[in-house]
Amino acid sequence: MTLLTSSLLLFSLLTSRLEAIPVLEKSPAHPAHSAHPAHPSHPSPGVRILRAPESLVAPLGDEVVLECETSLQPERFEWSHRSSRSQGAGFKYLRTGTAKANVSQEAAISRLRVLVREDTLGEYRCVGWFGPLVVTSTIARLELASTSLVGAQESESPLQWRVAAGNSVLWSCGQQVQSNPSASWSYYRNGVEIKPEFIGTNGNLILSNVSSESSGSYSCQATNPASGERIQLPGLLQLQVTPEQRSLSKSPHLLKGQPSSQEITIREGSSLLLLCPGVGSPPPTVVWSSPDVVGAVKNKRSKVFGHALEISDTRVQDAGTYICFQDNGVRPALEHYIKVHVEQPPQIVRPPWADLTNEGDRLKLECEATGVPSPEIYWLLNGHSSIDDTEAELSNNFLILHSVLKRHAGYVQCFARNRLGEHSAGTLLQVNPKQIQEPRESGGTHRPKPNQGSKQKQMYPPSPPNVTRLSDESVMLRWMVPRNDGLPIVIFKVQYRMVGKRKNWQTTNDNIPYGKPKWNSELGKSFTASVTDLKPQHTYRFRILAVYSNNDNKESNTSAKFYLQPGAALDPMPVPELLEIEEYSETAVVLHWSLASDADEHLITGYYAYYRPSSSAGEYFKATIEGAHARSFKIAPLETATMYEFKLQSFSAVSASEFSALKQGRTQRPKTSTTEEPTLQMGDRDTTTPSHNETFNMSPMLTGTLGGGAVLTLLLISICLCVCRRRSSRSRGNNPNKPRMAELRDDFVPLGNCSPTKQRQRTRHIHITLNPLAQQQQGMEEKNDTDQDAPYYQRPSSYDYDPGLRRMSSSSLRRSQRTLERAGGSNGSNNGNNNNLNQSTETGPVENPGKPGRVLMKRPRLSSRSENLSSGSLNSVGV
């Protein structure tokens, strides 16, 4: 059955239409359907400022609190200050616990309490220390609350306006007030406060559709919301409203003191209110338009209220000139122009990015930002200004380090700044230090030995590991061995210790093999390993121990201090979704995945890929994928034509995400070539995978014919072998002169022939005991057994004289004879128990003229072949 099934499968395979599978040269970097920026995702240290201190305006003598929060609890917080009285001075770290500044810390939140004085005004920064990493917040300004009049005369005479009923009157009473923060306004008519129709007019009072009841004396008052200071403006408005019927026709015109044009500056995201001054008789109709802004009036964010145009959620594209056109049928019409400027806080759109950099190399970092006015770009290296660094050069939006030094390793931050605020972005700069040759112990010149090379290979240590939290009790380490020509590394060991006094280094039990001596990137070869059984809410350091081919070892530099944060206190990381497992080759697959939102990429440093054969329940193999923009990755080497299961998780230095759903995929099946590949004479060529022209170049019809003929030939040969073996077995069984020993052995040989399954047969020890006295009964048993021989696998018994019996000792013959005589003397019958066959035997006297008095024991016949197989000791005959 097995042979037939295999033959049919081979026949179907050979007769199917086979085409060569093209060989892929390189794994695609990204799926085709996704868009990617010009540079990979910037490596993030995993720690960042979640909440920077905010700018405040307060009066003298008041106490303010500045708050700063980081994503992970730092080792310590510090605050720096730059006074507003010293122009051009740098930031200085504050001494805490003084009368004018006090710092308190609660987990990952730091609070700075400042007493507002002339010397405490200025700019403040929050600085978080995470081992060698320094993360700096954006600037918070502390300013003094103030309100003042600009160019106003206390003896200013009031305005006298006379208008026809039905007009809209605009009075700008707040043009002479300067307030920080912006003042709130109150309006009065005849000494009684009135509620304005529009709020947020910045000191402009608009009276729509005035009537005789609107006549009166108007005044206004400005209040500073921070200090509560109030200023009563000296200017007054005397308004007189006449009935429309009594007014003469007059074209639209401006009243005394009304501006002919306006220029307004507003912050992006605020609400903008444009007011159109002018009156006429009859009251004019107002039409709004803009030659610079398409759809400025007819959109969901704009509303027209006669002489007012309100634009909510102002955007940069709303900047431009707006025209208020007034017409009442009397020429000329009136046009009023309003110039709108929209300011935008700075926003970094292209953050800096840095990879592992060798010490002494040149590094160029770019930082691109938007904002109105155009923001100023400056850089901090681990909290220190790049201006003070002798190796740094600033060129437009670029930071150039002519020679990267060890002190540059850490966090590099780019800041974009304009008068509306600041925005920052950073990257982790890892510096691969130069390898320093160890000096020889003995001084003077060293003459090499005859058998010793002129240059001895060095032991290059691995880089210090980067640490990522996996769970409350485990972390993942990532390190790299830089490209070198030193001694090969055999295995790695991971060591860790808890930070504190008298804490020793612990070594994990796992040996991490180096693998093939092959660099998997331009910088070197990267590795990963996990460390378990750690304690949460404790700080650890890690290092890597490399064991070399000379059985010596060398340690890496220790990692930065890592605080193992409990998972409940961390925000969840975005979980990638495995989309497809592409069969890349016989030994490789390509994973394709996606994120729920590309906006989450700034939270991710890279991905961990886990895989193992689907038939295995062992531990997963791990692979590290650097860069948040990656959407595919090739995993190799794998077993040929093997099903694997895969899962992914994203990670940062703080934590790792939950695992994605398991997805299975297999490697390609082996490609069988029907042509022999010629031997290469010159050059290097990859012969592991046949090319398109070399694979299956025979036609499908010819291939099918040859395959079918081969299968039929195999079937005929198998049938002939089985028939011949069965005939030879029968011919041997019919030979009456065959020795008894050979007959018993042949009885059980056919059990292994023509077996339907190739199961492993259990080896049994054969114990055969011949009855030397049973030969005289040969004729009688042949007569009784001949008719029933076919249904049984046991051959007919033959007791012919065998010359081999002469070799049996006379003592054994006499013992056997006495046993039979005793059995025959017990009333001529006895039911003996055969322990091997578990069947009864019959004994009795048999008359034999040649040998009187001889008692023979008749051997029982087995009922079936299956009973023979289940006996367990078929080749033992009890006498």
Curated annotation (Swiss-Prot):
Signal peptide range in chain numbering = 1-20
Q: Name one GO molecular function term.
A: heparin binding
Amino acids binding heparin: R497, K501, K503, R541
Q: Name one GO biological process term.
A: compound eye development
Pfam families (UniProt xref): fn3, Ig_2, Ig_3
Residues passing through the membrane, by range: 704-724
Domain Ig-like C2-type, chain residue ranges per copy: 45-142, 132-232, 252-340, 346-432
Q: Where in the cell? A: Membrane
SMART domains associated with the record: FN3, IG, IGc2
Per the database record, which ranges form the Fibronectin type-III domain?
461-567, 575-670
The record lists glycosylation at: N102, N209, N466, N557, N693
Tell me which parts of the chain lie in the Extracellular compartment.
21-703
Similarity comment: Belongs to the immunoglobulin superfamily. IHOG family.
- What does the UniProt entry state concerning the protein's domains? The first fibronectin type-III domain mediates a specific interaction with Hh protein, in vitro. The second fibronectin type-III domain is additionally required for in vivo signaling activity.
Indicate what this protein is called per its UniProt record. Interference hedgehog
Q: Which species expresses this protein natively?
A: Drosophila erecta (Fruit fly)
Native organism taxonomy? Eukaryota, Metazoa, Ecdysozoa, Arthropoda, Hexapoda
Q: Which gene encodes it?
A: iHog
